[in-house]
Swiss-Prot record:
Name the UniProt record assigns to this protein: 3-oxoacyl-[acyl-carrier-protein] synthase, mitochondrial
Superkingdom per UniProt: Eukaryota
GO molecular-function terms, A-Z: 3-oxoacyl-[acyl-carrier-protein] synthase activity
Disulfide bonds: none
Originating species: Homo sapiens (Human)
GO cellular component, one term: mitochondrion
Domain Ketosynthase family 3 (KS3): start-end pairs: 41-458
Annotated function: May play a role in the biosynthesis of lipoic acid as well as longer chain fatty acids required for optimal mitochondrial function.
Enzyme Commission number(s): 2.3.1.41
Active site: residue positions: C209 (for beta-ketoacyl synthase activity), H348 (for beta-ketoacyl synthase activity), H385 (for beta-ketoacyl synthase activity)
Keyword Manganese belongs to the record: no
Transit peptide boundaries: 1-27
Phenotype upon changing F106I: In a breast cancer sample; somatic mutation
Length: 459
């Protein structure tokens, strides 16, 4: 028998063996309550959080303001916004005072010229998260074992429009050599990787409003499956501009309520659209034994990650919430958790009539009678909708809820409709009370029908 034939038979035999093994693993998994595939590998915990949000900059300062019922939504000023139906947004506060964002605290003046605003915000959030975690890899081995996954939902449109205008009116030489790097969605991850010499997986996600959740979930799997020991994961977006607001307004996605304190009101009968926000959130995810060995403070554990697609409409969710239901079910399945073990859901709920209703239906259909024992809240009344950063911000809020055992409120929810009959943590924060482990879900859904759910638990 020739060597070629022998090698061919070996390869064929190996493929058949692998196929049978995969079939056996799949056949042993039920819908809920099985040994999750991720647990056949390694546990993943969260040891650091960095937040750059409309509520401020930091970790515990932002959390305290969230729990205190504060909001970062403000009125838009300037003639350029006068013709746009939406007149509110949620800006990151700029300045040098406590809780304000000063770009020069994180990058040099020359870097500011070569980087976009969302990239700088991501660098700031990453620095805060790594400092919070106490993880600063110095050796080659530690750098190779640490990766980055930071996504961006939208490129900064004003950079494109201003560059196009300069090119058309002033010519080729007025196009910045940094134009292309500024608008690449992977540049936030790339800059963080370069800055800290992180040589593990270098990953960027761009899945609209699900970006941040996908980045955190993908990082969870990178660690669980041994691609890294530590991941610096999150999302960033900073695209509040007349052009982006006009685009979302034309899509009838934004609130037209001119009162910044009432414009974003998830689950409310008079909700009429979301409020655009900006910011970045980065979490340090770490293999459990790695964190224990270096005596890191552990906020929570990531138990599972679910994904789904609506396959329905470019902007509207499935009206029955079928995609959202499958997404949450997939996260429970991955975590090996029963629906009755969940006691909190950080809802995607952006304050749109269709989206909030669909998510509410999905929760009630999946959890059945147990839905009435759940607490469900949306934090977007406080932060606005941070688009590509939203999923990471809300993963951070769910993590902190597990750690402090407090549930962030749904602001502005002073009345409800008959179908919205769950505990939405209205107006004020609540103590998280359960006789079981503190386990929550956080949902993110985006244009194009892209969905993600993370299952996060206290230790």
């Amino acid at each position: 028998m020739s060597n070629c034939l022998q090698n061919f038979l070996k390869i064929t035999s190996t493929r058949l063996l692998c196929s049978r093994l995969c079939q056996q693993l799949r056949s042993k998994r039920k819908f809920f309550g099985t040994v999750p595939i991720s647990r056949l590998h390694r546990r993943v915990v969260i040891t650091g959080i960095g937040l750059v949000t409309p509520l401020g900059v930091g970790t515990h300062l932002v959390w305290d303001r969230l729990i205190g019922g504060e909001s970062g939504i403000v009125s838009l000023v300037g003639e350029e916004y006068k013709s746009i139906p939406c007149s509110v947004a949620a800006y990151v506060p700029r300045g040098s005072d406590e809780g304000q964002f000063n770009e020069q605290n994180f990058v040099s003046k020359s870097d500011i010229k070569s980087m976009s605003s969302p990239t700088i915000m991501a660098i700031g959030a990453a620095e805060l998260a790594m400092k919070d975690s106490g993880w600063h890899p110095q050796s080659e081995a530690d750098q190779v074992a640490t990766g980055v996954a930071i996504g961006m939902g939208m490129i900064p449109l004003e950079v494109v429009s201003e560059t196009a205008l300069n090119f058309q009116t002033k010519g080729y030489n007025k196009v910045s050599p940094f134009f292309v790097p500024k608008i690449l969605v992977n540049m936030a991850a790339g800059q963080v990787s370069i800055r800290y010499k992180l040589k593990g997986p270098n990953h960027a996600v761009s899945t609209a409003c699900t970006t941040g959740a996908h980045a955190v979930g993908d990082s969870f799997r990178f660690i669980a499956h041994g691609d890294a020991d530590v991941m610096v994961a999150g999302g960033t977006d900073s695209c509040i501009s007349p052009l982006s607001l006009a685009g979302f307004s034309r899509a009838r996605a934004l609130s037209t309520n001119s009162d910044p304190k009432l414009a974003c009101r998830p689950f409310h009968p008079k909700r009429d659209g979301f409020v655009m926000g900006e910011g970045a959130a980065v979490l340090v995810l770490e293999e459990y034994e790695h964190a224990v060995q270096r005596r890191a403070r552990i906020y929570a554990e990531v138990l599972g990650y679910g994904l789904s697609g609506d396959a329905g409409h470019i902007t509207a969710p499935d009206p029955e919430g079928e995609g959202a239901l499958r997404c949450m079910a997939a996260a429970l399945k991955d975590a090996g958790v029963q629906p009755e073990e969940i006691s909190y859901i950080n809802a995607h709920a952006t304050s749109t009539p269709l989206g909030d209703a669909a998510e509410n239906k999905a929760i009630k259909h999946l959890f059945k009678d147990h839905a009435y024992a759940l607490a469900v809240s949306s934090t977007k009344g406080a932060t606005g909708h941070l688009l590509g950063a939203a999923g990471a911000v809300e993963a951070a809020f769910t993590t902190l809820a597990c750690y402090y055992q407090k549930l962030p409120p749904t602001l502005n929810l002073d009345c409800s409709e008959p179908e919205f009959d769950l505990n939405y943590v209205p107006l004020k924060a609540q103590e998280w009370k359960t006789e079981k482990r503190f386990i929550g879900l956080t949902n993110s859904f985006g244009f194009g029908g892209t969905n993600a759910t993370l299952c996060i638990a206290g230790l």
